[in-house]
Amino acid sequence: MTEQKNKTSLIEFPCTFPLKVMGAVHPEFEQAVLDTVRLHAPDTQAHHITTRPSSKGNYTGATVQVKVENQEQLDNIYRALTSHELVKVVL
């Protein structure tokens, strides 16, 4: 038997995917997230991101609505965000 190369995904591409990002309270956090996402999804605009502080004010949460074409693009965005120094968690 041959191994099936196509993996089954629960996400239908292309789509607009909501990325949840948690990170440090920092004046550059929102712009850093936006710039990082734009490396892999250049059409992402400032109005695609919303931020809010955590309940205790220790972290900032951001949701970015990103148009992604395939799983590889989404994976690259996740990797870029998780490697950023201001980002703690990406969901």
UniProtKB/Swiss-Prot annotation:
Coiled coil: none annotated. Disulfide bonds: none annotated. Belongs to the UPF0250 family. Pfam families: DUF493. This is UPF0250 protein NMB1218. InterPro entries: UPF0250_YbeD-like, YbeD-like_sf. It comes from the Bacteria. HAMAP family: UPF0250.
